[in-house]
Amino acid sequence: MDFPIPQKTGPQKIALEARGLSCIRDDRVLFKGLDFTLKNNQVLLLEGKNGCGKTSLLRIICGFREQDAGELLWCNTAIKGSNYYAEMAYVGHLDGVKKELSVLENLKMSLALSQAGKYTIDQALDKVQLAGYDDSLVQSLSAGQKRRLSLARLLITKKTLWVLDEPFTSIDKQGIKLIESLMHEHISNGGMIILTSHHDLVLHEADVQKINLSACH
């Protein structure tokens, strides 16, 4: 599937900037002196062998751990002094859904904590091919369906930056095409995406930055 070059729309002059980021784990330097700037309509793909620090960098970007050196800026302001976390959504390996709740209850809970996005709950469920699963308990869903539910959470909330850790895990070919379509739609509307993936992205090359963390020691 080939996507057209995104028409640049949506919010402008928003940027996430890393300056000299370093991360140390168990006395081992995962990466150091890392710089990047991500703007509207762009994707940042993190590459590298297992254990090179891809997930650790995502955790720093999401505020789950502190960097050992350097700084992260959102619109030229340190992220802790900005509205950064209100603008960021994270989907990790565990999907981040409550297994004891229904599909609908999970989405209502997400919506209560965030500003509403362009999709209603019904529209989002239809978009990710979970229409009719409103009352289904999450614990009864397959791994792929749980991943689709996580994607629905992105659609119903208004977030500029999506941070995705291996989003194509547990997804079939149809689901891969769905995720690629949603990513293209998001950056076309002024969004930004940071992700790790072993899957070849089907997006316009000019909109994708790549960082190989294996080379950042």
Task: Report the location of each language-model feature.
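Conserved ABC ATPase signature
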Residues: L137-A143
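Q-loop/switch helix immediately C-terminal to the Walker
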Residues: L94, K99-Q115
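Helix-to-loop junction immediately C-terminal to a conserved catalytic motif
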Residues: C62
